[in-house]
Design a protein with these regions (language model features):
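Conserved catalytic-core segment of nucleotide-activated headgroup transferases in glycan assembly
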Residues: 1-123
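Catalytic binding pocket for nucleotide-activated donors in carbohydrate/polymer assembly enzymes
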Residues: 72, 96-198
Length: 198
């Protein structure tokens, strides 16, 4: 949806790029909605008419922050992290989508989630979770699937992990791209620790 907003003013484009880059540096708090002024929303609506339904409790700011901008941030962040990890490690990605921008990734196509994905989770050295930033504290279901299959999980910070799991014992959390790469490298070199956590 974000990329469909082709008629944004240069100011709005720059502003949105700036706040998205700032959000990508902060884990554990999603602040985008707070930064969307009336003028920015009006400019975005001009390019992408989006309104909450009559019986909706969400505001227009919430819709743009969570449905449009959060998804764009996730796309940018996932692409950047996958590019970085694929430059250092043999990396496979299971997706039905083509990934020409990730030339060093081995795109394995899609697999059946019920029959084949548990095998992938269990037998992958490291399974990555990069959550939508608009998921403020919750744990994505895929994380439970990975850990339930005995897979090793390296995930971005989500507050609820601390309520249900012990980081470093049940899973490993990263706080930045550098931390992500360092922990990936460490656990690939320390099989026993990785297997114990998995």
């Amino acid at each position: 949806l974000f990329d469909r907003m082709e008629h944004l003013s240069d100011y709005t484009k720059g502003y949105l790029q700036g706040i998205m880059q700032a959000q990508m540096k902060v884990y554990g708090y999603y602040f985008i909605e707070e930064l969307l002024s009336k003028e920015i929303i009006e400019d975005m609506q001009h390019s992408l008419p989006l309104q909450p339904g009559n019986d909706s409790v969400e505001s227009t700011e919430w819709l743009f922050a969570h449905y449009v901008i959060a998804r764009k941030i996730a796309n940018l962040e996932r692409t950047a992290l996958l590019k970085a990890v694929s430059e250092h490690f043999n990396t496979k990605l299971y997706t039905p989508n083509p990934t020409p921008e990730l030339s060093q990734i081995h795109n394995m196509g899609s697999v059946d989630y019920q029959r084949q994905m548990p095998y992938v989770f269990k037998n992958s050295a490291i399974n990555l979770n990069i959550s939508l930033r608009s998921i403020r504290s919750g744990i994505p279901l895929r994380c439970f699937d990975i850990m339930g299959c005995g897979g090793f999980l390296l995930s971005n910070y989500q507050g609820d992990f601390y309520e249900h799991f012990v980081p470093g014992e049940d899973l490993v959390l990263f706080e930045s791209q550098e931390d992500f790469l360092n922990k990936g490298d460490y656990y690939l070199k320390h099989d026993n620790e990785r297997r114990q956590i998995a």
